[in-house]
A protein has these predicted regions:
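Short, functionally important secondary-structure microenvironments
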Residues: 1-202
Length: 202
């Protein structure tokens, strides 16, 4: 019971340590299924970071995962439809990021979806280890994986593309300020030249 109580407490502490709400919101998908996948993967990232940096938390998180998996009946699941894809994806991210075996119920849930996930997003999953410590980089990977799994239409606009557009607009605005319309100056120069010519003729 002590370990069971420590698991959720550690999970909350790891979320506070490794999770930035603004970054999370920035890359969050719009659709329900895509968002569930995104949330599950980010939770797994935080827990995996904790397991790496503070190994003592790993066992407590394992107990939490085991309890949740058994409570939801994942140990008795017989087919993929018995387990939400988002849950299995989160388990797989944690397993691949830490190398730790999952508790039995969670292991069963992951294995039911493993073939599908690896077939659709195996190449993207290979980048997990390198992006784990950078939440924004991991969020981009998560969005790519969501697209791989067939939910790209639920992602919404790419926040990085929006930033590029804003930067381009800012640069254009800056160039216009630095290079103002010279028509007015040209007209003034012409008028001054004409005036000088009239004076010389007089």
């Amino acid at each position: 019971e002590v370990l069971l109580a420590r698991g959720p407490a550690d999970a909350l502490a790891l979320n506070r340590r490794y999770h930035d709400a603004a970054t999370h919101a920035r890359y969050a998908p719009q659709g329900d299924m895509a968002r569930e996948l995104y949330e599950a993967m980010e939770t797994a990232r935080c827990e995996a970071m904790g397991a790496r940096d503070m190994p003592g938390t790993a066992g407590n998180i394992d107990v939490k995962i085991k309890h949740e998996a058994l409570r939801r009946g994942y140990d008795q699941a017989k087919q993929a439809s018995d387990v939400p894809l988002s849950v299995a994806a989160g388990y797989m991210v944690r397993h691949m990021a830490t190398g730790r075996p999952l508790p039995a119920g969670a292991e069963n849930a992951m294995e039911l979806w493993r073939g599908f996930i690896e077939d659709q997003a195996g190449g993207t999953l290979e980048g997990i280890d390198g992006s784990l410590a950078d939440q924004a980089d991991f969020a981009r990977l998560a969005r790519k994986m969501i697209s791989d799994l067939g939910y790209g239409d639920q992602l919404g606009d790419d926040p990085d593309s929006q930033d590029d557009e804003q930067e381009d607009q800012a640069e254009e605005g800056s160039e216009e300020e630095q290079d103002p319309d010279s028509t007015g100056q040209d007209d003034q120069d012409e008028e001054e030249a004409e005036g000088t010519q009239r004076l010389s003729q007089e």
